[in-house]
């Protein structure tokens, strides 16, 4: 009988230890969850702090973009009106190319007009060595796969240029330039004629703020909301 009591007593002690161990593990899990939440909150506060230090958060990017839109030109409204007659009229005028370039920069697609300008400059080359150097420069910058400012060309056009780049002629980029010109005429040019940059030139209207800053503020607000919710956990 005494042996039985000792046996059951031993079982009770084991059960008590198991319960105590379970409670410790359960409590440790909660503590670990709270620590992870605090770490996440701290990381998000750090990200928000870095974001607040960025110049564009305070509107400098917006300011520079607005300055780009409002850049003054000496072109008259009468001359600017002619640019709406055709894309060729726009490209034939230096101020037209400049205004169109500024517009494309607001759409982050200025590589097209830069390629067109580079081709125009290339066709003015008179020395063979200069022709080769400029041809390679254009190829490296605009044509080859993964070029820093690669333009949208079909495979055949790119292949022809690639094969002739070692011995270029003044017409090596004609097909590519024509292709890019068509893309701009049927796409970007139509939007340019409705843009603030062009309307400002022909009407002298005040520039409306671009929506670039609003996007930045929306992003910042979302970041702040995440941090705010995690700070509540922290507290």
Curated annotation (Swiss-Prot):
The modification Phosphoserine is found at residues 49, 216, 218. Pfam families: RGS. One of its GO terms (cellular component) is cytoplasm. One of its GO terms (biological process) is regulation of G protein-coupled receptor signaling pathway. It is found in: Cytoplasm. InterPro entries: RGS, RGS_sf, RGS_subdom1/3, RGS_subdomain_2. The keyword Iron does not apply. GO terms for molecular function: GTPase activator activity. Residues 86-202 form the RGS domain. Keywords: Cytoplasm, Phosphoprotein, Signal transduction inhibitor. Inhibits signal transduction by increasing the GTPase activity of G protein alpha subunits thereby driving them into their inactive GDP-bound form. Binds to G(i) alpha-1, G(i) alpha-2, G(i) alpha-3 and G(q) alpha. This is Regulator of G-protein signaling 18. It comes from Rattus norvegicus (Rat). The lineage of its organism: Eukaryota, Metazoa, Chordata, Craniata, Vertebrata. The gene is Rgs18.
């Amino acid at each position: 009988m005494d042996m039985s009591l000792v046996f059951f007593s031993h079982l009770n002690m084991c059960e008590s230890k198991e319960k105590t161990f379970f409670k410790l593990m359960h409590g440790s899990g909660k503590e670990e969850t709270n620590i992870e939440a605090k770490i996440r909150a701290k990381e998000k506060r750090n990200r928000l702090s870095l974001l607040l230090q960025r110049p564009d958060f305070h509107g400098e990017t917006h300011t520079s973009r607005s300055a780009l839109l409002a850049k003054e030109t000496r072109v008259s409204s009468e001359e600017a009106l002619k640019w709406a007659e055709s894309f060729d009229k726009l490209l034939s005028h230096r101020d037209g190319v400049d205004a169109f370039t500024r517009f494309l920069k607001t759409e982050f697609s200025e590589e097209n007009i830069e390629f067109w300008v580079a081709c125009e400059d290339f066709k003015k080359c008179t020395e063979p060595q200069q022709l080769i150097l400029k041809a390679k420069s254009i190829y490296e910058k605009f044509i080859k796969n993964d070029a820093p400012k690669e333009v949208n060309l079909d495979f055949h056009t790119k292949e022809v240029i690639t094969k002739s780049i070692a011995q270029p002629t003044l017409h090596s980029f004609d097909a590519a330039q024509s292709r890019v010109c068509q893309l701009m005429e049927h796409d970007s040019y139509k939007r340019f004629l409705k843009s603030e940059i062009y309307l400002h030139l022909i009407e002298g209207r005040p520039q409306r703020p671009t929506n670039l800053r609003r996007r930045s503020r929306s992003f910042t607000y979302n970041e702040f909301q995440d941090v705010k919710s995690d700070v509540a956990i922290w507290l």
